[in-house]
């Protein structure tokens, strides 16, 4: 009997720490026995709500970072498009100036030749005042030269207008390409935004 009592005491002493641990994890006093069950459930629910709150805050932070990145991407895309448009406008201006200078020089050269022909005709006319045949020949040559000069001016004008038309066509094609690239970039951005929106919206727990 004494041995049995001793073992019983050892068992009681061995269970004592376990009871202390249980009481530490479940600090319920006798006063808590009369506590409202809803308050007890509320206490156990608070840590879960805190975890869900932290999880929701982390998702919102990530979404905010994604939105900032998307805004930076849009700004960079529009900046690149503006640079391309400015470069296109500068190139157009340079090409137009080059065409104007080219045909301006040709016009000046042609009119200078025309003036020289008129001056030569006047000189020949003065020399051939007393020679009717020479005068007729000089007149014929002058008319032929003037006709050729006018024809050359007409051809140059047509070439000038054709050059301007080709320049406008090329500029339109380049603008169309820039617009196409911008639309393509916006389409990619829209798909990426929808993908990330669906991804993070599915991460939230259902309200049901």
Curated annotation (Swiss-Prot):
<dbReference type="Pfam" id="PF04803">
    <property type="entry name" value="Cor1"/>
</dbReference>
<dbReference type="InterPro" id="IPR006888">
    <property type="entry name" value="XLR/SYCP3/FAM9_dom"/>
</dbReference>
<feature type="coiled-coil region">
    <location>
        <begin position="122"/>
        <end position="143"/>
    </location>
</feature>
<protein>
    <recommendedName>
        <fullName>X-linked lymphocyte-regulated protein PM1</fullName>
    </recommendedName>
</protein>
<keyword id="KW-0175">Coiled coil</keyword>
<feature type="region of interest" description="Disordered">
    <location>
        <begin position="1"/>
        <end position="43"/>
    </location>
</feature>
<comment type="similarity">
    <text>Belongs to the XLR/SYCP3 family.</text>
</comment>
<feature type="compositionally biased region" description="Basic and acidic residues">
    <location>
        <begin position="22"/>
        <end position="33"/>
    </location>
</feature>
<dbReference type="InterPro" id="IPR051443">
    <property type="entry name" value="XLR/SYCP3"/>
</dbReference>
